[in-house]
Structures are given as C-alpha cells and as structure tokens.
Amino acid sequence: MSPQTETKASVGFKAGVKEYKLTYYTPEYQTKDTDILAAFRVTPQPGVPPEEAGAAVAAESSTGTWTTVWTDGLTSLDRYKGRCYRIERVVGEKDQYIAYVAYPLDLFEEGSVTNMFTSIVGNVFGFKALRALRLEDLRIPPAYVKTFQGPPHGIQVERDKLNKYGRPLLGCTIKPKLGLSAKNYGRAVYECLRGGLDFTKDDENVNSQPFMRWRDRFLFCAEALYKAQAETGEIKGHYLNATAGTCEEMIKRAVFARELGVPIVMHDYLTGGFTANTSLAHYCRDNGLLLHIHRAMHAVIDRQKNHGIHFRVLAKALRMSGGDHIHSGTVVGKLEGERDITLGFVDLLRDDFVEQDRSRGIYFTQDWVSLPGVLPVASGGIHVWHMPALTEIFGDDSVLQFGGGTLGHPWGNPPGAVANRVALEACVKARNEGRDLAQEGNEIIREACKWSPELAAACEVWKEIVFNFAAVDVLDK
C-alpha cells in the first residue's frame, strides 16, 4: 500500500452531506501560474450565503457532488478540486456576487475547448441553490494555451496572402440570405467583388438547402471571384460556409473548396460545436485555407447580464479552437454591443498580451504567448454613414461587413460596393492625415460624396437610419 493511500485510509470515511464551503471555499489560497481562473457572476437563492454559493460553483464544476463519497479517499482532493478563493459584491446589484474560482490544470484535456467547457460550464448552471449564474471571464494560463493550435493563420499571414495592408478589409453578406438559386447567388457575389469589396459571405444559415445545394453554390461563387480578380487585379474571397450536419460532411465541403482554389471557408462555431470547429481549423492550417467564423446562437448564451456566458469567454474559446475572423458586434449597428465591452474582447482577439481592466470588463490579465490573433468582424445594420465610426473604433485589423448596406443601394450591387470602398478609402486617408474621425466623420463622408455619385446616392438613402436602443449587457458601475 502506498503512503498516499495509507494516509487517506487512516482518515476514515464519514458518510453524509457537508456544506460545500467547508471544502471548496478557500480564501487563503494563492493562485498558481498554471491555474485556469474563472470569474462567475453568482445570484444565490434566498438564504444561501455567498460563500456557500461560490463554493458550490467550484465543487460542481470540478470534483464535488452532493454528498460525501467513499471514493474520495482514493485520490487527492486537495490536488484536483476547484477552489473559490475570493468573493466580491457586485456594486449596484442586489444579491449578486463575483465568485473567483481556480482550477488545477490537470482537470482538463490538452487542446480541448470541449472538455474545458464541459467541466467549467457543465451541470453547475442548473444547480438549484443558484437563481442565476454567469461566466464573466476566464484566465487561460500559457501552459494550457500552448496545447492549442489556435487560428489557422492569423492576422499577418492573412494580410500577406491577400496582399492588402493599411486599412480594414471590406465584406458583404449576400442577401436575401435564403431563396436565391446558385447562379443568381454567384452573380451577386461577382457584382459586389467587382465593385471593390475584398470579401463576400454566405449567411450563417446557408448550408445545402433544396433551392441551392452546396456544391452548386461553391462552383458559381468560385467562378465569380476568379472573374472579379481578373478584372480588378485584386485578390478576392467568398466565405463558403462548410457547416454541415456531420464533421465528415463539413470536411468534404472544405476539401472541395480547397480543390477549387478559393482562399477562405466559413463555419458556424457555436451551432457546429467546438470539436467540429477545431477539426476544421486544423484542416485549414494544413491546407492553406483561411477560416471565417460566424457566432450564430451566441445571444442565446451571452446576452442576459445575470445568466449564461459572456461573449469575451466565447471569443477566447474561439481563439483557442481556431478561426481567422469572428463576428464581434458593431457598437453602432443593429446588434447588441456596448462600446467598452466590445473593445475589451476585440483586444482579447487580436493582441498577444492584455492587462486586467475592469473598466472594459476584463477580469484577468491574459497572455496568449505565440497564439495568432483573430480579425474582429463588424457586421449587422451598418451603412456608409457608419464608416468613420467603424474605422475609428476597430482600426485597420478588422473586417467591416455591409450586407444590406451594399445590396440595398438604389443603383444596384456594384454601385453599393463602390460606395463602401470609397467611404472606407476616404476615412483611412483622413485618419492618416491626422483628422478626427469621431468628430469630423460626417464631414469627411460629405466631402467624398462630391467625387463619388455612388456614395452620394447611398448617403441619401440611409441618412436617417439609426438603431437607438440601450444595450442589455452593460458594465457594472
């Protein structure tokens, strides 16, 4: 019998139910560089102390169960258990607390976002002692980061592949998202790329439906982008959505895209799942394909302030699982996105090292070591009048994607693309000359309208379109 087993046997087994805080609330614990750290927003049921609630989260997301079990004596709980090491009250909220939990790295399989989430956000979110629970942030230690491939290529490699520098990239989601035939779909792709866009995009729910099978769409879109490349002298791309009902079918579609010689494919990473996404990211790295990621279903998970998973966590998970682009909100468009919060997770997507900054919702310092960055994609209800704000908010390393803001142009798709390209070039030029895009944005666009009738027409159509709704998910004040 080993000394470890002898020690545990000597303690003896006492059946029954213990309060979680007796084992899992350890305010004296000093976190290790190798721990995964989590910040949970906890809303306990009436009568449940915050220490017990925080300890319950640590227990149920690591080694604990509802009662003492004799097999606890066969392992080292002190080595493997999660620990709630700090609790702080949320200012301005009744009965809400931030519980900080540390997890030993040995609890997680290397290179598996799936396993990490199965532990940290598995059964614990249905725990009866909690009225609500939200995972606000994770600190991923470098030791765990290094077990992931991450994005297939990253920002610099993508720019080198496309030979495009010094400005944001421009995209367009083809509309209507459902119902077009493959040939008409390809026509819209060609017209937008020919007009000056860098990318066009399948919408998230375009897979392989009766009105347009995936193989037909891939063929017509490849023809469209090659024709646009020949006529413009610029490298073009279309995000061919490879998302499918099985991983095998998804990879088959990615293989066909590679055989066509296109530069980029797409995946819906939340509905498709992290295992499928990581598999596709590895295929894209090995075969020179860029990977665009759509976040369909994210608001089901992240929009409510007191329950779910914050998008900054989903963004970190995507960087680990793999993707070269991901939709990140616009701040100014039709979709949810508060400015400081959005800029916080945009930095977490792009930068190598991000300091803790609670003013932007960042609970932990994050060191990504050598993991490539991800381009944030601003998309959803944006048009030419938003271009100065988008350029100022997101900077050069971003993709600005106008669907209705291109295809809704009164003169057609090519002039819609021209209007967006002219507006972007005008904003970049003004910024490089030292002008303030936030203060002078409208004036910059009006000046550009004088030498671009396409832009002038777009400005007239969308001059009164705004989306003035308060964000649901805002920072604690």
UniProtKB/Swiss-Prot annotation:
Residues modified as N6-carboxylysine: 201
Positions of transmembrane segments: none
InterPro entries: RuBisCO (IPR033966), RuBisCo_large_chain_AS (IPR020878), RuBisCO_lsu_C (IPR000685), RuBisCO_lsu_C_sf (IPR036376), RuBisCO_lsu_fd_N (IPR017443), RuBisCO_lsu_N_sf (IPR036422), RuBisCO_lsuI (IPR020888)
Compartments, record wording: Plastid, Chloroplast
Pfam family name, one: RuBisCO_large_N
Keyword Disulfide bond: yes
One cellular component (GO) term of this entry: chloroplast
Broad class of the protein's primary localization: plastid
Residue(s) at site: Transition state stabilizer: 334
Name of the protein in its database record: Ribulose bisphosphate carboxylase large chain
